[in-house]
């Protein structure tokens, strides 16, 4: 389910399943919102006879592909979010899958985590440089598993001759490598992923070293290998 469980429905986690955590915080200089899905143990492959909807690894990879496809998109200025929203769903649609929540929402500055009117719904305002929004495709199987990958992005001007826009991802947390089926990713998606990991290393690595968090630093290096 895309919603948090109640105290009455919570149960003990096991190493044989995925865990989705949607987290964030309010700070004087901004608000954060991020979702990662991880697997505690060994992940089985996604080869037949399992359909993608019963194969968590393939489903996760398709959600990640949607996140990447929308995050790296270049689009004309004044484009409405609802116009490009399908890029986040395309990889899932290719397998006959979908999700039942919005693809993203505006982020407040020490205000609402979900802030109107920025986002990817049909009634949101056109995207403009300087706006922050989330990109968070997902996939859910009630009683089995849930997947969501959420990053916060800044709308910026693209390096094009005409007035176009693109997104700059400001969430710097690696994805779970065990859940990624590289055979499904295009060369462009792999290049994007490697570039994103280089950015995480460059920005987060030195801070972990400064705080002498060596175990966290080693985890970061391992999690961001090309």
Model-derived features: where do they sit?
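Active-site neighborhoods and metal-handling regions in enzymes and metal-associated proteins
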Residues: 1-226
């Amino acid at each position: 389910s895309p919603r948090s469980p109640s105290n009455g429905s919570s149960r003990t986690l096991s190493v044989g399943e995925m865990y989705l955590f949607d987290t964030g915080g309010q700070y004087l200089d901004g608000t954060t919102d991020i979702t990662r899905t991880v697997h505690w143990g060994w992940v089985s492959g996604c080869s037949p006879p399992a359909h993608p909807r019963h194969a968590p690894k393939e489903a996760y990879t398709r959600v990640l592909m949607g996140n990447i496809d929308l995050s790296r998109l270049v689009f004309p200025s004044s484009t409405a979010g609802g116009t490009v929203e399908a890029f986040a769903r395309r990889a899932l649609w290719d397998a006959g899958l979908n999700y039942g929540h919005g693809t993203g929402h505006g982020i407040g500055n020490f205000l609402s985590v979900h802030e109107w009117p920025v986002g990817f719904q049909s009634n949101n305002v056109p995207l403009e440089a300087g706006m922050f929004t989330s990109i968070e495709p997902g996939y859910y199987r009630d009683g089995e598993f849930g997947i969501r990958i959420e990053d916060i992005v800044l709308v910026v001007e693209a390096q094009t001759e005409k007035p176009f826009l693109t997104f700059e991802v400001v969430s710097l947390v690696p994805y779970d490598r065990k859940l990624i089926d590289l055979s499904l990713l295009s060369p462009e998606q792999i290049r994007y992923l490697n570039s994103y990991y280089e950015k995480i290393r460059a920005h987060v690595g030195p801070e972990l070293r400064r705080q002498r968090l060596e175990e966290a630093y080693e985890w970061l290096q391992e999690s961001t290998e090309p």
